[in-house]
Amino acid sequence: IHENTILQEIIEKLQTDTVKDEKAAVIQESPTVSMIFHGLSYMDNLCMSLSRRIGNIWKNSSIRGSIRREYESLLGEEVFDMKVEDLSERQKYQLIYSRVMLQNPQIVYCIKPFKGADLAHRIHIWKLLEMLLDRGITVVDISLNLSDSLSLADRLLMIEHDGTVREIPKENFAFVPRNVPWRTFYRGSKNEVTGRY
């Protein structure tokens, strides 16, 4: 089985299982395309993950005003009055990660968070992931790119085809080959999932 097949199976499982769980969130691959709800306001996009927790979030101007005041310093005042279609790529990333922070899950699964991002956006994404970690939220980076993943991780989990999991602590990252594919590193066909707990 190819690494991408295993990765796809993990992603599909996460997307179906975490939908019902407030304590878990998924940041999808290419989130500025897949997680922005066009036609909705910036505030509606930001509050999307709260609808299960706060039943009347859409009509409660008091709660929405409080959220705006709390997040203005992080997001900027101007974005709240912009159409989501007019946001910059950076502002879209900020919106998505702020939505997750507002949800306040215990764990966030990030599917290929750096895929397709240029250097400036990679740095911005890395800082946003650090913000989640600083809030005590566990971040699991589901990727095939070890270089990006290991910069944030405090351990590496190798999942073998038979489901066996091998953990590599941060102090042993220097021995992990960075070249692709890593078949020589694996005993069987595996995929890697990194996370910081």
Placement of each model-derived feature along the sequence:
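Hydrophobic anchor residue at the start of the ABC signature
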Residues: 97
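ABC-family nucleotide-binding domains
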Residues: 111, 117-118
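Conserved H-loop
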Residues: 136-142
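A short, surface-exposed alpha-helical micro-motif characterized by mixed small hydrophobic
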Residues: 149-151
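ABC ATPase nucleotide-binding domain signature region
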Residues: 1-54
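Helical segment within the ABC ATPase nucleotide-binding domain
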Residues: 122-135
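Conserved beta-strand-loop-alpha-helix hinge in the C-terminal portion
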Residues: 163-190
